[in-house]
Structures are given as structure tokens and as C-alpha cells.
Amino acid sequence: MKRLIIALFSAMIFLCGCNQKPTDEAQTVIKFSSWGSRTEYNILKQVISDYEKANPDVKVEFIHVPENYFRKLHLLYASKTEPDVVFVNNIYAPLYIKAGLFEDLSGKIDEGEYYQSALDCFKYDDKLYAIPRDISSLVLYINKDLIKKPQKITDIYTLEAEAKKATKNGVFGLNYEENPLFWNTYLGYFDGGILSDDGQRIIFGETGSIKGLQLYADMINKDKSIPHKWDMAAMTSAQMFIGGKTAIYLSGRWLVPKFNETVKFDWDVIPFPQTKTSKTLVDASGWAISKSSKHKEKAIDFVKYLSSEEVSEKFTETGLITPARKKIAESEIFLNPNKKPRNSRAFLDALNQSKPTPVNENYLKITDEITKKLENVFNGKKQASEVVDQKFVEKLQKHCN
């Protein structure tokens, strides 16, 4: 009898064990880091849950860093505790690629399914180091109550004129953050910029760059159509647009959900004007894999899921991104005419004549020095040509050698 009880008990344990999910010891743990808003966080948590259900032998450890993401990421790499899968943008990517920290992902996806500009944001020496989730181009958000005929804005001078005309009664014609990401559009219009396309030469002192900088500064100090920092008090540029204090606002797709929730007036978007030779600067975010990962095959499989059409649709539905996948970008999910902005195609039209923001591993050091140097240009105390002299350009060039 005793033997029978033991046998039955053993059988029960065996049967129960057959129905159990893999234990933590049997699972491969993949560490995945990302920044992101609450909306993005919620999507990622669901995406991870779905992936784990389909792949019970994998556990994804999600490292969500809502602020100071890259500072945290630097520390993780320095302490040899880096994630297997890393969400990254093209501005910071060179730091990790040049240091040999990212895996070459060439051949892991069908590149024909993606916008070339998005792929180029993560390509170095013809190798792909991250799979793009989105591609970001800057457009002009228009307060249609204040700008009745936005179609008149066909070049940078008609933009200047419309902004000047709209500046009255406490309203500024144009606004955006005083950051290289935004004012660089002015330089690009005149075929200028900060760095050459290969990131090896400073072009900040060239004629087009100086011309674009000065036009931007003149709109602040002469036309008074762009506010000084002190004109904004404690408001952000986005808050000024939401409050009807700005007629035209230069920014990216990420503000669409916020504007849909808070803006009370009629609004839409149009492309930032271009010449026949100028190119819109674009940026991208995507998923990379640490070269040191001990679970590369699992990590690659997870990244393929993150970059799938199914997941791309989830992010696109929020309005936060312009998807890097062409099929999703051209679908009604993104181009829905019943949702604002009704002219979402403006984000895609900008890609027809575009290039990635030229960067190198020292790009942030370069822009930090430029930002400090330009204060007297933007406050009207000096001309751009006085401040951006040969000596300053040579100083910046040291970050390229």
C-alpha cells in the first residue's frame, strides 16, 4: 500500500510538471532598455508580454529610463551590465558604434520595407547597426485661425513674411526651441549646416550656414516674430502654440497626441520649405543589440518582433511617430484624413528630399560649444559672421580629427 501511494504521488508530480511553464532557471533572460512616455511604456509592456507568451523560453527584463536615458546607458556599459537590446537614436548611436559596442545587423531585415533615410541614420561603413522604429522630420504646425493661407509659404522668405505679418496683439509669428535640432533647418535651407555629410568636417563657418543663422537671428531681433527666451516667461514653445500665442510652430511628429488633446483651434501641418538643392534633415530611433550580448540569437529574434508590422502599427496608432516602415506610413493608420493633422503626408513628403542629420561621436560636444557661442547672436548683440570666425571653426574641427 505504501509503495502504491508513493507511486501515485510521483505520477501526480510528473503530470503537474508537464503543464508548468519553463522556470526562471530554464528561461533565457534578455535585458532591454528604452526611454519613452507613459503611452510608449504601456505599449512596450504589452509587446513584451505578447512576445513572452509566444516565446515561453524567453524572459524580457525591461529597463525603462524616462529621463537622462543616455547617461544611464553610459553607466551600464561602463559597469559591464549593458542591456542585450538597446533603444537608441542616430545622434547618440555613433558613440557606441565607434566604440565597437553594437552588433552589425546587416542582412537581418528586408531593407526594402523601410525608408532609406531611416536606415541611413544607423549605417556606418555600409553596415546597419540598428533597426529603425521611426523617422523624424520637422514640419511647420499651423494655427489656421491665424494663418489663413499657409499655402503661401513656399520658401524661407515667404515663411519670414507670414511670420512677421502674424506677429501682433501678443502673438508671435513663429516659434521653436532654441536648440541646434531646430535652428539647423535654417542653415540647411541655404545648403549649410554644422557638419559635412560624412561627419568629418565643420561647415558651420561656410556662407550658407552664416546666412541661415543670421536670418534666424534677424527674425528674433529685427522682425520680433520669434520670441526671446524672456518673452516666453515660464512657458515652453509648445505651450505657447497650444495657448494661441504662436501662429507657426516648428517641431516633429511627437507632439501630435498632445496637440490633439489640448489645442482648441483648427490646426494642421505643412513641410518646412526647401530649395531645389537643400535637403530636410531627418533623425531616427531604433533597436540595436550589444556586441557583448550572450544571447544574440534571442535578442535578434526579439528585435525582429519589435520592428514587425504588428508592433509598428501599435506605435503609429498613438500619433507619436512617423513609422520607418513604408507600408505602415502609407496606410490609413498614419494618413487617416479624419484625424489631425489632416495633412500627415507632409511628414512623408519631407522624406523625398532628405538626409540624416550629419553627426559623429563628438557631435554633442560640438553643439554644446556652438550653443554657448551663439548667445550673443541670438540676443542681437553680434552678427553671426563676427561670432563664427575661422578661429572658432578650427576649434570645432578638433572634434572631427
Region spans (language model):
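Periplasmic solute-binding protein
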Residues: 93-101, 117-154, 177-198, 281-289, ...
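Short, solvent-exposed loop/beta-turn-alpha elements that line the ligand-binding surface or hinge
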Residues: 104-114, 172, 192-213, 260-262, ...
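Glycine-centered hinge/linker elements that transmit conformational signals in sensory
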Residues: 161-166, 201-230
